[in-house]
From Swiss-Prot:
It comes from Mycosarcoma maydis (Corn smut fungus). Keywords: Acyltransferase, Cytoplasm, Transferase. Residues 78-95 have a biased composition (Basic residues). This is Glycylpeptide N-tetradecanoyltransferase. One of its GO terms (cellular component) is cytosol. InterPro entries: Acyl_CoA_acyltransferase (IPR016181), NMT (IPR000903), NMT_C (IPR022677), NMT_CS (IPR022678), NMT_N (IPR022676).
Length: 706
């Protein structure tokens, strides 16, 4: 479980900085199901690439002046340059990227949608026809011609340009944030850093230190304000946080929707197992004691590829609208960082929509219409041209009832099985949380609410979790979603958008043929509960702490028991699974998510939202999710690593915003000007992976931000 934090558009510098902000589902006319990408749009080079170009130009000037000088390899500088150029061209040709300026210009012309029909070869038309026939049959394939293919490409280019223009305007408004001196002083990856090439280069940017080396006094606040620790078990104080967020928290760009966090939701998120009361920080007006700002952190164990560490998720950064000129947000960030350091945690994860130094992953929001009529009435989605409301509603109809044998709500007796299934499934991703059984019970069951007498549903329910149990009593699948409504700020007819957000899911189809997937992975597990025996050490970290080791010295030690840790053994990575496993996974996930949509409809949700993390790309199109105009960027505080694929690239223009794509371009440039075999191999691998449609493989990001 991850947190959201953020503020409205005009919140000062660091209001976005350390906030984990999933913005409210914004109104979007692009709610229609996505079309498969037919071509790769030309990619804009980023500022870092421009810097590289300048450096390369300088190198070329030097080479001209020293062309006659022979090196140890017997070649002149000019000959070496020519050799490297040929090698780069060979690499590009091998990867299907085009080998000459002519190839590049042809690609740009085709991708622009303005090309004449003659620019589209018969081979391209045949390839598209075969792809369409495989998905939609021969009738649809026969309709593919050069003329309508050119029109489709033009439409895709319009979508790409509109999306990039929207993102560009937002980025200009946020440029002051990214350039602010605050980030220059923080242990975060910078655009000017050398790219991470080897695994041993991944890790902490700054070392952990003992508490006595951490600042002991709170950071100073402007006059008339004072710090306060919020007790979330105190109903009055929790209500104050709720009121502050309700009136001042994240809105969409058009100020039409605002998240409406319930007290039950806040209780569920903020009281994560192992939470620290000192990480729930508020600012009051000294004279009136009115709460005017808040920030919080949630403890989690985070795994990034092969390394795991204790971290904090920064959430709910909010400053009262009337006080945003006081620059409270940067001070809030520094204070919550100080409090985390005092308790021995020196790493964090946070998300925002804007680009800061430096995203480790980026994903896009998708929305699945449930109540089509209401969404159209409030401006959340648009009815396609020349389509009636009745036809629009019919597009999103779902089956009358679920049809999945063994489906039922999750119960506490399922925690051990669900925990094991989740740990195995999440181990597939490059970046993911590590949940103990205790945490699984909290995130999936503690938000169930209380049963309503004589009625369906539960009072204060936040989470809905379901499992699929086979005839042998084994849980083969699980999925969950949570409720996060948004207030509608400009509608006379509707006051609330009842939104469900896709949470975690897992299925055992990815472990076909794995003889260990159905049995305990360790002999220390209790046969009845599946948890570690009480006679065994609880976890590496717990043992170290019990032995007197300080918390700051235990950041790399796991909270998982030996039994739980063994659940992650021998699991293939998401991008190395064979095609037949991906096919089975796609089929199963489409069935599970379709079932989830029916349940969401039956509980009166208007829309189901998600981002392109986990394996979501495998079902988005078939389940009629449409792309929104929001993007969620993931950031790691005090951790250096290669970017993580966030499921971007299926839609026009997404590649330009993807950190993985930018990293691949950067490494390709570097590979063309180096003899380092490691760099060349990594560049080739990155470029090849970047060309794969995420709808075929999913993503490497296993984090769901709440």
């Amino acid at each position: 479980m991850s947190g959201i934090a953020g503020t409205s558009q005009d919140t000062s510098v660091a209001a976005s900085a350390s906030s984990s902000s999933t913005r409210p589902a914004a109104a979007s006319s692009s709610i229609a199901p996505p079309s498969p990408s037919l071509t790769t749009a030309p990619v804009k080079e980023q500022e870092q690439d421009d810097d590289d170009d300048q450096e390369n130009d300088d190198e070329e000037e030097e080479e001209e002046g020293t062309a006659a000088i022979t090196g140890a390899d017997g070649l002149t500088a000019k000959q070496r340059k020519k050799k490297k150029s040929k090698a780069a061209a060979k690499l590009r040709k091998k990867l299907g990227l085009g080998g000459s300026p002519t190839d590049a210009s042809e690609g740009k012309l085709l991708a622009s949608g303005s090309s004449r029909e003659g620019k589209i070869s018969d081979e391209v038309v045949s390839q598209v026809q075969r792809a369409v026939q495989a998905e939609h049959g021969s009738v649809a394939a026969n309709a593919v011609t050069k003329a309508n293919l050119a029109k489709v490409m033009a439409m895709m280019n319009l979508e790409r340009d509109a999306m990039l223009k929207s993102q560009d305007s937002k980025q200009k408004a946020q440029k002051a944030i990214a350039d602010h001196k605050f980030w220059k002083t923080q242990p975060v990856m910078k655009p000017t850093d050398a790219p991470v090439v080897k695994s041993d280069q991944e890790g902490s940017i700054e070392a952990s230190v003992p508490p006595e080396q951490v600042r002991q006094e709170p950071y100073p606040l402007p006059a008339d304000f004072e710090w306060v620790m919020i007790d979330v078990d105190n109903e009055g104080e929790l209500k104050e946080v709720y009121d502050l967020l309700s009136a001042n928290y994240v809105e969409d760009d058009d100020a039409t929707f605002r998240f409406d966090y319930s007290p039950e939701f806040l209780h569920w998120v903020l009281k994560h197992p192992g939470y620290q009361k000192t990480w729930h920080i508020g600012v009051r007006v000294a004279s009136t004691k009115k709460l005017v700002a808040f920030i919080s952190g949630i403890p989690h164990e985070l795994r990034v590829r092969e390394k795991s560490y204790q971290s904090t998720e920064i959430n709910f950064l909010c400053v009262h609208k009337k006080l945003r000129s006081k620059r409270l947000a940067p001070v809030l960030i520094k204070e919550v960082t100080r409090q985390c350091h005092l308790t021995g945690v020196f790493h964090a994860i946070y998300t925002v929509g804007s680009v800061l130094p430096t995203p480790v992953s980026c994903s896009r929001y998708y929305h699945r219409t449930i109540n089509a009529k209401k969404l159209a009435e409030i401006g959340f989605s648009a009815i396609p041209h020349n389509m009636s409301m009745e036809a629009h509603v019919k597009r999103f109809e779902l089956p009358a009832k679920t049809n999945l044998p063994g489906l039922r709500e999750m119960e506490r007796r399922d925690v051990a099985q669900v925990g094991k299934l989740m740990r195995r499934y999440m181990r597939r991703f490059d970046m993911a949380p590590r949940f103990s059984d205790h945490e699984v019970e909290h995130i999936l069951l503690s938000g169930r609410g209380e049963a309503c007498q004589g009625g369906r549903g539960r009072k204060g329910q936040v989470t809905w979790t379901y499992v699929v149990e086979n005839s042998e009593g084994r849980i083969t699948d699980m999925f969950a979603f949570y409720s996060l409504p948004s207030s509608i700020l400009d509608s006379d007819k509707h006051q609330s958008l009842n939104a469900a957000y896709l949470f975690y899911y897992a299925t055992d189809v990815v472990f076909q043929g794995d003889c260990d997937c159905d049995s305990d992975s360790s002999g220390v597990c209790d046969a009845e509960t599946g948890r570690a025996s009480t006679s065994q050490p609880s976890s590496e970290r717990a043992v170290a702490l019990a032995a007197g080791k300080a918390a700051w010295q235990c950041n790399s030690l796991t909270n998982l028991t030996s039994c739980e840790l063994a659940d992650e053994a021998r699991v293939a990575a998401w991008d190395s699974e064979p095609a037949h496993i991906k096919t089975a996974l796609k089929t199963r996930l489409n069935l599970l998510i379709n079932t989830l949509l029916i349940i969401a409809r039956d509980h009166d949700f208007d829309v189901v939202n998600c981002v392109t993390v986990m394996d979501n790309a495998l079902f988005l199109q078939q389940q009629k999710f449409g792309p929104g105009d929001g993007f969620l960027r993931f950031y790691l505080f005090n951790w250096r690593t290669k970017p993580v694929a966030g499921g971007m690239g299926a839609r026009p223009g997404e590649a330009e915003l993807d950190p993985v794509q930018a990293y691949a371009r950067s490494m390709a440039k570097r590979a063309a000007h180096t003899d380092d075999d490691d760099v060349k191999r990594l560049a080739e691998q990155l470029i090849r992976n970047a060309a794969i449609n995420p709808a075929e493989v999913g993503s490497g990001n296993g984090i769901v931000m709440v």
